Amino acid sequence: MVHGTIEEETRLTLSHIGKVLAQAGCTFEDVVKCTCHLADINDFERFDQAYREFFTGVKPARTTVQSVLGGGIKVEIDAIARVPGGGQSA
């Protein structure tokens, strides 16, 4: 856990999500839904600028809410992605 500006925490969080996506053979283009929790909803515009650096094409559905986050973090993001070829048998 790293504490920084909302932009830094957003970029770090999405970088971690990107690594998990890559392990599943996915990219950010495969993300269909994100639920984003901000410690302070007043940070939304700055959060959104950093978020859009990762989602450059068609944006996934997104819910963003203010939440009480533990450990003094500013952002938490849950992402759901479709796995290419997932659910198909050979």
Which residue ranges define each predicted feature?
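Short, polar/acidic, helix-capping and beta-turn segments at strand->helix junctions
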Residues: 1-90
